[in-house]
Amino acid sequence: MNAAGSPAVNAQTAQRWVLPQTNSTAASILAKSAGLPLIVAELLAERGVRSAAEADVFLHPRLEHLLDPYAMQGMAAAVTRVQAAIAGQELILIYGDYDVDGTTAIVLLKTALEMLGGKVDFHAPHRLREGYGMQAEVLTAAAAQGVRLVISVDTGIRDFAAAEAAARLGLDLIVTDHHLPHADLPHALVILNPNQTGCGYACKHLCGAGVAFKLAQALLEAWDLDRTRAKVLPSFLKMLAIATVADAVPLLGENRVFASVGLEQLRRPASAGLRSLLQVAKLDPARRPLTATDLAFRIAPRINAAGRMDVASDVVELFTTRDAARAGELAAKLDRLNSERQQAEAAMLEQIDRRLGEDPVFAASRCIVIEGDGWHRGIIGILASRVVDRMRRPALVIALEGGEAYGSGRSVPGFHLLHAIEGCKELFTRFGGHSHAVGFSLPVERVDELRRRLQAWAELHVEEAAPSMLCHAVLPLDQITEALFSWLRRLEPLGNGNEEPIFIAYNVRLTAPVRPIKDRHVCLQLAQGARGASWSALGWDWAARVQALGLQQGSVVHVAYKLRENAHPEFGGLELEIADLVIAG
């Protein structure tokens, strides 16, 4: 159904509509063997599904689809050392991070170790005072308190100095991390990272909590296999689903199992902390099942607010306390911190937008580097994402604090941001990250040199091209049915790597006058085919564009759209959400 010869560019927005190069023969074979509608088979083929068995795993993810934790390099050695620490009642320190991934990883591993009888302490670093990564000073204090085993979660793979400090202090170090390793690895007893050279673990895109979960899974299954699989792991997946969605790892492979089973388990939030957090986020899974969107935009920001605006250890307490009143207090605090974060973000974004519009240098830059005094260091990552959304180019936002500059960067598809900053690594005090996101610090006087060198790198690696929108398939409006929508729902949970499908319909006519909704929005009635039914198509923030296009009853357009279900008791049913639209012809 991905027809060739279709219009590729929206002339009104200069936005290219890009369709994947689907193997139609393979999709047809998959549709027949798995009993799928052809368009669903096409969507699955785009996601790497090749057989009926793989289609069943994708469409019906279950707990038994979890991978063997011992397939991860180093797992046997890690389990042996942790079991010895538990048996000997050694004090174990879990060293995490301050974001959703890092704090939930602490909760998962701490809960597992304490279930097994371990003596556990944890450290969630303060974003402003300590920054990202393990610090030698913290390890020194831990050793003085009797710690003999340190397990890092969502951090450690590039913490060479801290690893050396651990060795000098006589601490055994197990690094569990998902960030891309350097060519060299830190000195540690064991490293668990699916991305390290020689590791054959099938799912390379686990989040940090995912790696910590695999260690917990191996330990718990060795303790009581039946109980672990029947009760413990499903419960753990509630927390892991939040981390997996929040860290924007691809929702494919084992991550899809984490997210899908975890969302199902979240229908019954047993812990006081989860119940309280859902309450302040105004989510009731008893009335409506949670979605990945709920986790990404309603739950994760409140958890992240603790590390951005205050202390991340509040998150660990929230999810481990059994005191309902205390859980309510902590959830209310996270909700308040999230509101403060939103206000600070809006004020900083206004400054950035003004500078981007006033300074012509930014318009010509292939990579945006923008810095400011007094910017809140806990919010610069969000702001970098906002700049990427606006400029469609890699962006680094830097907060200047005295003589030190703290930065966060986000990228665009095809531009490996970590490789870019590795090309000028001598400028940094510290740095790390992924292909699409980085964090770093450097002396203020080196910011201009960083800007110059990143611009030179970007000139070679960022293509000048019209902004593009990935569409997934051609779906004429007269082929939409309730049955097809039911099949499409099985693609959930949706997210990175398994995006909500955007369909294209060509030569669609408006069957009624444009109906405005609250000034900024519109509702169009669209139909296709000689006897095609008319569909409501909602255009959020489309009022000005529809007016500029001069659309009226009888106009013929090409439309890129998402398929939605309106749950309104009186006006419910399927409807379209406009992603883009262009006049036909």
Feature map (PLM): residue ranges:
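Hydrophobic helix-and-loop "lid/oligomerization" segment in the mid-to-C-terminal part
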Residues: 20-24, 29-146, 169-170, 221-445
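Mid-to-C-terminal polyanion-binding domains and interfaces
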Residues: 10, 84-88, 326-370, 415, ...
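Conserved strand-to-helix beginnings and helix N-cap segments that scaffold or border functional pockets
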Residues: 106-107, 135-136, 163, 185, ...
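Conserved phosphate-handling catalytic cores of large alpha/beta enzymes
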Residues: 142-148, 152, 156-249, 421
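Conserved beta-strand positions in the Rossmann-like core of class I SAM-dependent methyltransferases
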Residues: 121, 174, 549
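An acidic intrinsically disordered interaction segment
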Residues: 1-19, 167-184, 270
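Low-complexity, acidic/Ser/Thr- and charged residue-rich accessory regions of DNA metabolism proteins
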Residues: 2-53, 70-71, 474, 508-509, ...
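A residue-level signal for conserved active-site and pocket-lining positions in enzyme catalytic cores
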Residues: 44, 151, 304, 488, ...
